[in-house]
Amino acid sequence: MTQALLCMSHSPLLDHATPPAEVKSAVDDAFARARDFVEAFDPELVVNFGPDHFNGFFYDLMPPFCIGYRAHGTGDYDSFAGDLDVPEDVAADLAQFVLDHGSDVAISRHMEVDHGAVQPMEILHGGDAGARPILPVFVNSIARPFVPMSRVRAFGHAVGDFFAGTDKRVLFLGSGGLSHDPPVPQFATATASQREFLTSGRNPPPEARPARQARTIETARRFAAGEAEIMDLNPEWDRAFLDVCRSGRVEDFDRYTADEMDAAAGHSSHEVRTWVAAYSALRACGEYDVTYEFYRPIKEYIAGFAVTTAQLAGEA
């Protein structure tokens, strides 16, 4: 088995919220299943399709896709803060291959990755996001304008094509979603100070990030209590998306539009773009089977929370 997939939701609230014990136990079990899958596969490289939450990417320059040649964690929400083990030569070869095959991608020689990318790595490796070689691939999932989902699929397919002939064990990792609408300012309706942050907030004053995080934690508390004025989770939408993942018909992702996603599943549901890229990458390597699926709508985490694993057909 040379390619496999793990897609999972993340939440900065994992260590800052208290869901019912049964829910927490179910999530922990899903994480354990994911760890077992990854340990058995033992990837030599993790291609990490991750979003960002205005910690590393801002409107001063917001690409739809970006491949990191070097990267480090931002440490938001007490997540991993440090250098990641990125094979720069592989990153450079991948970027050129993707460009040569019709997908426009930016590159970064100093990528900052936040909890959205590093949290799954921490969960899988006992808190050490740098435990395995990682190739960080940013997929814009929060900042309009968005490319059509067909472009995300094509980008993921190109990444998969690059690795299809390798003899290395490569794990495609997608992080984010599913339905959720946390308190992230939208540029169109933001205040002047919020717009300034969304554009050039890369080096905020020391008190700014804790204040942002405290607002999110408080919103989660109020949301779980039925008091927060944010969009509810949408389990029906989530399950329909998981159905497409399971079907192997990645072209069906093309029907998802940005406006529909905002209206049905919340402004941050666009994080499923990382899943679309990851599943499309695996499909480029061959037909696949989803081997595990977990889903719960969890208000304490402000997320329709899912974990899936997949491997190429016939490689069980």
UniProtKB/Swiss-Prot annotation:
Annotated metabolic or biological route of this protein: Aromatic compound metabolism; 3-phenylpropanoate degradation
Top-rank EC class of the record's enzyme: oxidoreductase
GO molecular function, one term: 3-carboxyethylcatechol 2,3-dioxygenase activity
InterPro entries in the record: DHPP/DHXA_dioxygenase, Xdiol_dOase_suB
Active site: 115, 180
Enzyme Commission number(s) from the entry: 1.13.11.16
Example GO biological process: 3-phenylpropionate catabolic process
Cofactor: Fe(2+)
Origin: domain of life: Bacteria
Catalysed reactions, semicolon-separated: 3-(2,3-dihydroxyphenyl)propanoate + O2 = (2Z,4E)-2-hydroxy-6-oxonona-2,4-dienedioate + H(+); (2E)-3-(2,3-dihydroxyphenyl)prop-2-enoate + O2 = (2Z,4E,7E)-2-hydroxy-6-oxonona-2,4,7-trienedioate + H(+)
Signal sequence residues: none
Keyword terms, alphabetized: Aromatic hydrocarbons catabolism, Dioxygenase, Iron, Oxidoreductase
Subunit comment: Homotetramer.
Function: Catalyzes the non-heme iron(II)-dependent oxidative cleavage of 2,3-dihydroxyphenylpropionic acid and 2,3-dihydroxicinnamic acid into 2-hydroxy-6-ketononadienedioate and 2-hydroxy-6-ketononatrienedioate, respectively.
The family this protein is said to belong to: Belongs to the LigB/MhpB extradiol dioxygenase family.
Protein name as it appears in the record: 2,3-dihydroxyphenylpropionate/2,3-dihydroxicinnamic acid 1,2-dioxygenase
Species, as recorded: Rhodococcus rhodochrous
Source species taxonomy: Bacteria, Bacillati, Actinomycetota, Actinomycetes, Mycobacteriales
